[in-house]
Amino acid sequence: MTTPQEDGFLRLKIASKEKIARDIWSFELTDPQGAPLPPFEAGANLTVAVPNGSRRTYSLCNDSQERNRYVIAVKRDSNGRGGSISFIDDTSEGDAVEVSLPRNEFPLDKRAKSFILVAGGIGITPMLSMARQLRAEGLRSFRLYYLTRDPEGTAFFDELTSDEWRSDVKIHHDHGDPTKAFDFWSVFEKSKPAQHVYCCGPQALMDTVRDMTGHWPSGTVHFESFGATNTNARENTPFTVRLSRSGTSFEIPANRSILEVLRDANVRVPSSCESGTCGSCKTALCSGEADHRDMVLRDDEKGTQIMVCVSRAKSAELVLDL
């Protein structure tokens, strides 16, 4: 099996690179010698070191039973920080790329008996892996709702409109017209016993799903975002962070994140998106009350974990397990 380097990253090869929709490319990553890759489960993501020096996190979208490859889809984001553009424009088939081990902050709940999967745009990637896994298992039913602007911008369109998937997938195009948005009320009006909802997409879609599932049992509706939220909408105040292992304290000013301050002090914390959406910087919280601004943590994790790239403090001090 492929083994990580000293920095914990795998050195893989871009076995194939293909444009699969408007502004969206798929990348198939394999071991250069053909060795099996470390396993993953549906919902997992990995971090890629892209040519411009930044690191970006992408969800795996292939079948989790496959051990010979990782498949990701990358959307070219002209309004981003350049990571996706560099990955798409500055790589070719056959190039080497450094990739983290897969990690999963968005797993399918083993207690669920059926699933509603909701994807918006490039948010299809973890949902497709989930759908593949559920189809392979053949034990639990699912229905995938996939919302995009038009067919040309729909990743995996040909596959998901094939006879194989037709009975399990509903694709809806709004053509950029808000009045043609999909009406989810009939989907979420009533929940079935042990039915869970998984949603990945733009903030507006997640807000809609959250609003329509407010009456569902706690812990049955799960979200993963691929875009930053407006964390600046709240007023920032300074606070102190203390590291439990060294006892060192840092003042976090109103205009800087915990991650930025720790990075300047050469305190190693994994990171990628820096928008509270990927889960890379999740850090154990020993004491203090956090002001959670991420889109990753479940309610039952918020007392003991914090995403240091965006979240701040409600108390005067936070103690982190670093």
UniProtKB/Swiss-Prot annotation:
Give residues annotated as binding [2Fe-2S] cluster: 273, 278, 281, 309
Q: Which PROSITE patterns match?
A: 2FE2S_FER_1, 2FE2S_FER_2, FAD_FR
Describe the location of the FAD-binding FR-type domain by residue ranges: 7-109
Q: Which CDD domains does the entry link to?
A: fer2, PDR_like
One Pfam family per UniProt: Fer2
Q: Which cofactor does it need?
A: FMN
One term of GO molecular function: metal ion binding
Top EC group: oxidoreductase
Segments forming domain 2Fe-2S ferredoxin-type: 239-322
Entry EC number(s): 1.-.-.-
Q: Could you list this entry's UniProt keywords, alphabetically sorted.
A: 2Fe-2S, Electron transport, Flavoprotein, FMN, Iron, Iron-sulfur, Metal-binding, NAD, Oxidoreductase, Transport
Q: Which domain of life is it from?
A: Bacteria
User: Which residues participate in FMN binding?
Assistant: 56-57, 73-75, 81-84, 125, 226, 275
Function summary: Component of the electron transfer chain involved in pyridine nucleotide-dependent dihydroxylation of phthalate. Utilizes FMN to mediate electron transfer from the two-electron donor, NADH, to the one-electron acceptor, (2Fe-2S).
Q: Which family does it belong to?
A: Belongs to the PDR/VanB family.
Quaternary structure, per UniProt, is: Monomer.
Question: What name is this protein filed under?
Answer: Phthalate dioxygenase reductase
Q: What is the lineage of its organism?
A: Bacteria, Pseudomonadati, Pseudomonadota, Betaproteobacteria, Burkholderiales
